[in-house]
A protein has these predicted regions:
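Extracellular beta-strand ligand-recognition surfaces/modules
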Residues: 268, 302-337
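Beta-strand/beta-sandwich contexts
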Residues: 27-69, 116-155, 185, 194-220
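Short carbohydrate-recognition loop motifs
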Residues: 226-249
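Surface-exposed, short loops/turns at beta-strand junctions within beta-sandwich domains
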Residues: 99-106, 179-185, 311-313
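C-terminal motif of bacterial Sec signal peptides marking the signal peptidase cleavage site
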Residues: 21-25
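Extra-cytoplasmic beta-strand recognition segments
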Residues: 212, 254-276, 303-305, 336
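Short, aromatic- and glycine-rich surface loops/edge beta-strands on solvent-exposed regions
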Residues: 104-115, 185-194, 317-321
Length: 341
């Protein structure tokens, strides 16, 4: 079948609503009783039906070839895939890849089984684009190993500021990689066959990720605790929790860092078990100031503050937070550090 005929066929499928067998010009190809043969696969949404060898779950594709009129089964990576027999002619099959089709450690094959035989075709079902949850340690030195947490890490490559990192090992949810030279203040990107994801916190910018970096700390008299739970952390595996009474606070220690020229400001992540409000205080400025108030929910919220918003301080000396609803809430802090953009 010519490509323009395939396009016309697809249009006829749409007009028919997939509810009846094609007729007339939409079913001009008659079965010949021979064994099936797959010639190409194309995305159904592509008006030009350009041949491809990589597809994605929950998307429809056109299998083009011959001998399909008695199709009984379709398999992607040996997964039995539902198809509508009303969307089958002798030369074309419209089928949607099942969303649960596996993509790791699989055959990378498409198979069509008919009454007269079976056809096989090299075809990759790719995972969704990767997602980067976080990495640790943020303040790793060049040449040090980091652990990247996330999802859909199928055969990943890792770059830091455009420089290639050495992947030591990987699973679908975790990558161990060695930072290349020149990684400081650069961002980590994970790339797979399905796309790329860049993590927003740059290497070497942490005040707190899973631990505080000297000289910073929250002193024990604050009565806070550290919770280790990767599934609930904003960054890494461990975050800070404190039940703060109305108008109470959690205070960072006082110190001095005037090496700020490489940064554009600071950021931190906040959340609470129920709706709350915290006022941020930097270098002692902001107590009781409602213009510094941040509403919190059960979802992590990143707050980014530029040096201009902070009054262009000569040094960073302290970061603290004041409860601002007047009631007691459980508050959580994570990923406190400097920004580079």
């Amino acid at each position: 079948m010519k490509r323009k005929t395939m396009i016309r066929t697809f249009a006829c499928f749409l007009l028919a609503g997939g509810l009846a067998m094609l007729s007339g010009s939409c079913s001009s190809d008659d079965g010949n009783g021979g064994a099936p043969m797959i010639e190409s696969v194309a995305a159904a949404a592509d008006a030009n039906l350009e041949p491809i060898t990589v597809g994605y779950a929950a998307n429809m594709y056109v299998i083009h070839g011959s001998g399909f009129s008695t199709t009984q089964k379709i398999y992607f990576n040996d997964t039995d895939t539902y198809f509508n027999p009303n969307l089958v002619t002798d030369t074309d099959i419209f089928v949607t890849i099942d969303r649960d089709t596996p993509y790791a450690d699989v055959s990378n094959k498409l198979r069509v089984v008919t009454k007269t035989g079976e056809a096989e075709f090299d075809f990759i079902v790719a995972p969704p684009a990767p997602g980067v949850h976080s990495f640790n340690p943020i303040n790793a030195a060049d040449g040090q190993e980091i652990t990247i947490y996330g999802s859909y890490f199928l055969n990943p490559t890792v770059t830091v500021g455009g420089n290639t990192a050495t992947v030591v090992s990987s699973t679908l949810t975790e990558i161990h990689a060695i930072l290349p030279a020149g990684s400081q203040n650069k961002k980590v990107t994970v790339t797979t066959i399905s796309g790329s994801a860049e993590y927003g916190t740059a290497v070497g910018t942490a005040i707190y990720d899973d631990v505080f970096y000297s000289p910073w700390d929250i002193e024990s008299w604050n009565n806070h605790v550290y919770v280790t739970d990767l599934s609930k952390a904003a960054q890494g595996t461990t975050f800070i929790k404190k039940s703060i009474e109305g108008w109470g606070n959690i205070q960072g220690n006082w110190n001095w860092n005037d090496q700020l020229s490489g940064y554009t400001g600071i950021h931190f992540f906040l959340r609470s078990d129920d709706p709350g409000k915290l006022v941020w205080i930097v270098n002692g400025n902001g107590w009781g100031n409602d213009t510094h108030a941040i509403t919190t929910t059960k979802d992590w919220k990143e707050v980014r503050l530029t040096w201009a918003q902070l009054g262009n301080p000569a040094a960073l000396q302290n970061i603290s937070f004041q409860e601002f609803t007047g009631s007691t809430h459980n508050y959580y802090l994570d990923n406190i550090g400097f920004t580079v953009d």
